[in-house]
């Protein structure tokens, strides 16, 4: 069982996934800091409040903390933008796949289907 686990974990895809998760976690911390320490104060200058995470409004007894939601939206947008650019970069670096031209010679199945189609067309005329 340990041998199977060792084979499973040492596959290239599993190692790539592990590295991706670790880098993703570190990147999330960087984005959170960027939003909390740089972007929020910048936005706060324009709306008069420095800490967006404390923004809220109350209706009756319900309190809506929309500041934290704004932080989450900003984090998501930044991460999505970075992932988009990374995918574009990787796609440019990957060699283009040559499009295989279809074999012009029809298979037996295609020939039979064509005959059936032609017979049906003749029958309906």
Swiss-Prot record:
MF (Gene Ontology): mechanosensitive monoatomic ion channel activity
The keyword Disulfide bond is assigned to this record: no
Cited SUPFAM superfamilies: Gated mechanosensitive channel
Primary localization class, coarse: membrane
Keyword annotations of the record: Cell membrane, Ion channel, Ion transport, Membrane, Transmembrane, Transmembrane helix, Transport
Membrane spanning residue stretches: 15-35, 67-87
Subcellular location: Cell membrane
Gene3D superfamilies: Large-conductance mechanosensitive channel, MscL, domain 1
Keyword Amino-acid biosynthesis: no
UniProt-listed InterPro entries: Mechanosensitive_channel_CS (IPR019823), MS_channel (IPR001185), MSC/AndL (IPR037673), MscL_channel (IPR036019)
Topology with respect to the bilayer: Multi-pass membrane protein
Domain of life (superkingdom): Bacteria
Pfam families associated with the record: MscL
A single cellular component GO annotation: plasma membrane
HAMAP family, per database record: MscL
Function: Channel that opens in response to stretch forces in the membrane lipid bilayer. May participate in the regulation of osmotic pressure changes within the cell.
Family designation: Belongs to the MscL family.
Subunit structure: Homopentamer.
Name of the protein in its database record: Large-conductance mechanosensitive channel
Organismal lineage: Bacteria, Bacillati, Bacillota, Bacilli, Lactobacillales
């Amino acid at each position: 069982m340990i041998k199977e686990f060792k084979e499973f974990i040492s596959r290239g895809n599993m190692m790539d996934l592990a590295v991706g998760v670790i880098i993703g976690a570190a990147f999330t911390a960087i984005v959170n800091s960027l939003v909390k320490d740089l972007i929020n104060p910048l936005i706060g200058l324009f709306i008069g409040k420095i800490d967006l995470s404390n923004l809220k409004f109350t209706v009756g007894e319900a309190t809506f903390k929309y500041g934290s939601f704004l932080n989450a939206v900003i984090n998501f947008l930044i991460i999505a933008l970075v992932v988009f650019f990374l995918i574009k970069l990787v796609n440019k670096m990957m060699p283009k796949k040559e499009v295989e031209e279809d074999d012009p010679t029809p298979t037996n199945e295609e020939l039979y289907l064509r005959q059936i189609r032609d017979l049906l067309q003749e029958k309906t005329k």
